[in-house]
């Protein structure tokens, strides 16, 4: 099976003792796209202005101002320009270890399952969704605390992130696990394409790398557009 490490982002976000950071970004001014990848940290994309395309797992969305996209550890995701459009957004990235340690009930019940892909969160939070105002208020507060950096701001940010996750867990229902056989196959196929883009690549090669039959690979779900009603 191909090595999937090149799809994995390993950049350190924030200080080692406080792994949290916010990055303002604009597509296409800063870069035309963010290639398909995953990481061990939590990543939020908070769309501030304009529109763009966001892929989360096997689903693609038309992102609009106000949307929040939630990428748990291990979830494949990508961003790109919607033709003729500009999208301004904030990347909010943090390690789950920041929020709880060993022996902590919240870590055992929520954070560790989220880290390992056994607990899924909604990948998109839109303005009309239940809990949106609560969740977005937490992000606004975390942004402000991070900007001011007064004494104790780390405690405030940590608290707001926990409240944000609580808002998502409260509306998640019976979501499937974040990492499924389909997404694992997608990671393998994308890695294979990255490694062999200059040569011929056949469905049989991809199926062999995934450990499944060509028919199963061909009929697996493909990324699909989800339009806002």
Annotate the PLM regions.
Residues 2-25, 76, 80-144:
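A hydrophobic/aromatic-rich effector-binding and dimerization subdomain
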Residues 22-38:
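Conserved short histidine dyad/triad with adjacent acidic residue
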Residues 30-31, 66, 74:
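Tight coil/turn sites that cap or link beta-strands
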Residues 37-53:
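Short, conserved beta-strand element in jelly-roll/cupin
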Residues 58-70:
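Short acidic-glycine-tyrosine-enriched beta hairpin
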Residues 66, 216-218:
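Short hydrophobic/aromatic patch on the recognition helix
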Residues 121-132, 146-210, 224:
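Short, Lys/Arg-enriched, Trp-marked, Pro/Gly-tolerant hinge/linker segments that flank
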Residues 218-225:
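Conserved small/polar residues in nucleotide/adenosyl-binding loops
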């Amino acid at each position: 099976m191909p090595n999937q490490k090149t799809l994995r982002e390993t950049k350190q976000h924030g200080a080692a003792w406080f792994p949290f950071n916010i990055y303002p970004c604009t597509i296409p001014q800063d870069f035309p796209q963010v290639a398909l990848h995953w990481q061990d940290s939590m990543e939020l994309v908070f769309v501030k202005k304009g529109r763009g395309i966001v892929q989360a797992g096997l689903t693609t969305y038309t992102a609009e101002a106000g949307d929040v996209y939630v990428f748990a550890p291990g979830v494949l995701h990508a961003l790109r320009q919607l033709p003729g459009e500009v999208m301004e957004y904030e990347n909010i990235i943090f390690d789950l270890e920041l929020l709880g340690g060993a022996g902590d009930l919240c870590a055992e019940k929520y954070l560790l399952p989220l880290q390992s892909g056994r607990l899924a969160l909604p990948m998109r939070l839109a303005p009309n969704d239940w809990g949106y105002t609560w969740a977005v208020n937490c992000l606004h507060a975390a942004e402000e605390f991070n900007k001011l950096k007064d004494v104790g701001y780390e405690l405030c940010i940590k608290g707001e992130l926990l409240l944000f996750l609580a808002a998502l867990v409260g509306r998640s229902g019976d979501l499937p696990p974040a990492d499924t056989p389909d997404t694992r196959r997608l990671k393998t196929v994308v890695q294979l394409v990255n490694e062999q883009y200059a040569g011929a690549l056949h469905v049989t090669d991809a199926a062999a790398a995934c450990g499944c039959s060509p028919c199963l690979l061909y009929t697996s779900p493909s990324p699909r557009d989800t339009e806002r009603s």
